């Protein structure tokens, strides 16, 4: 049994130590994100048996952004299976920025990873759907099943994203021309942009992690969301590419599958045990929350979790 006092102390200590850490800046290329108050910070644990521990601004709702890629990858694995995802999208780190097109050029147009923009757009196109709205509703539903029913599209974030997503539109057409997009290019880009524009809070983000930790069963609703045998593929991708250019450093120092988003959220999974999530808007140069990384790493270290430990 996990010690409730120890878990609450871990999040309290992480928050106290790092919530006012200086450094980083909000993403400024998406107008909505530039205006989120930079002093916000939160950290939370949700255990695989459904206990919740949090500190800071844990009710504040922020844009899910790239963490949505985990949810869409999960749905694609349910729809087409791990082999098809590997064949049609890839399962390798790119070693390049999340919005890079260089990896596409180097690998014949194949995006390599579902957790960078090119691969995520391709993954969105893999979802079984007859039209744009069905594709979008299925992705929204999996986000809600994994994290909580309150996860919803923000029209303000979506508008802010849709009017600035020219680079992603270009990526979508490159994928389409290379044969690695499986629906209309602008449909894939539209739905991908929407999936990044949902709002979530830190406890819900930790719930997403706890659902993965529990082998696909949401510990708060007790409903099976994913097949248990698909979860290791998701965690492997998170370990390889979840923090973009910081992924190797994160694996080396923290040793947990993770995923960040430019909205300031960051998630880590302790398989079989818990999800750990944090939020704070200022980002490092790779697009990861500066305080969020420190808070999640602190919780993991205090509790002694690292998947590479014997």
Swiss-Prot record:
Q: Where does substrate bind?
A: 66, 117, 161, 168, 192, 244, 262
User: Looking at the keywords, is Ligase present?
Assistant: no
One Pfam family it belongs to: Glutaminase
Report the EC code(s) recorded for this entry: 3.5.1.2
- Name the chemical reaction catalysed here: L-glutamine + H2O = L-glutamate + NH4(+)
**GO molecular function annotations of the record:** glutaminase activity
Identify the InterPro entries for this entry: Beta-lactam/transpept-like (IPR012338), Glutaminase (IPR015868)
Extract the SUPFAM superfamilies matched here. beta-lactamase/transpeptidase-like (SSF56601)
Q: What keywords appear on the UniProt entry?
A: Acetylation, Hydrolase
**Annotated positions of the N6-acetyllysine modification:** 294
Listed GO biological process terms: glutamate biosynthetic process; glutamine catabolic process
Q: What class of enzyme is it?
A: hydrolase
This protein's source sits in the domain of life called Bacteria
Q: How does it assemble?
A: Homotetramer.
Recorded family membership: Belongs to the glutaminase family.
In Swiss-Prot or TrEMBL terms, this protein is called Glutaminase
Q: Which organism is it from?
A: Escherichia coli O81 (strain ED1a)
Q: Which gene encodes it?
A: glsA
């Amino acid at each position: 049994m996990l010690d409730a006092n120890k878990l609450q102390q871990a999040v309290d200590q992480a928050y106290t130590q790092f919530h006012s850490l200086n450094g980083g800046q909000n993403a400024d290329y998406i107008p909505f994100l530039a205006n989120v108050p930079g002093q916000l910070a939160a950290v939370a644990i949700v255990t695989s048996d459904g206990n919740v521990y949090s500190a800071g601004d844990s009710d504040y709702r922020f844009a899910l952004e790239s963490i949505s890629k985990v949810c869409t990858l999960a749905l694609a694995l349910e729809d087409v299976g791990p082999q098809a995802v590997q064949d049609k999208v890839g399962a390798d780190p790119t070693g390049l920025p999340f919005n890079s097109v260089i990896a596409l050029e180097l690998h014949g147009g194949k995006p390599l990873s579902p957790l960078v923009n090119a691969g995520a757009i391709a993954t969105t196109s893999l979802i079984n759907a007859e039209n744009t709205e069905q594709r979008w509703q299925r992705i929204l539903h999996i986000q809600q099943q994994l994290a909580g029913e309150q996860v919803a599209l923000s029209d303000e974030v979506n508008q802010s994203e849709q009017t600035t997503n020219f680079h992603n539109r270009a990526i979508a057409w490159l994928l389409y021309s290379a044969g690695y997009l499986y629906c209309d290019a602008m449909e894939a880009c539209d739905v991908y942009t929407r999936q990044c524009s949902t709002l979530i809070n830190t406890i819900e983000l930790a719930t997403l992690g706890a659902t993965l930790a529990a082998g696909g069963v949401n510990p708060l609703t007790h409903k099976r969301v994913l097949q248990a045998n698909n979860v290791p593929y998701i965690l492997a991708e998170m370990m390889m590419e979840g923090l973009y250019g910081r992924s190797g450093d994160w694996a080396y120092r923290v040793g947990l599958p993770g995923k960040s988003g430019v909205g300031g959220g960051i998630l880590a999974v302790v398989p079989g045990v818990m999800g750990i999530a944090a939020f704070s808007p200022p980002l490092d140069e790779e697009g990861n929350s500066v305080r969020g990384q420190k808070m999640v790493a602190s919780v993991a270290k205090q509790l002694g979790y690292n998947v590479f430990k014997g």
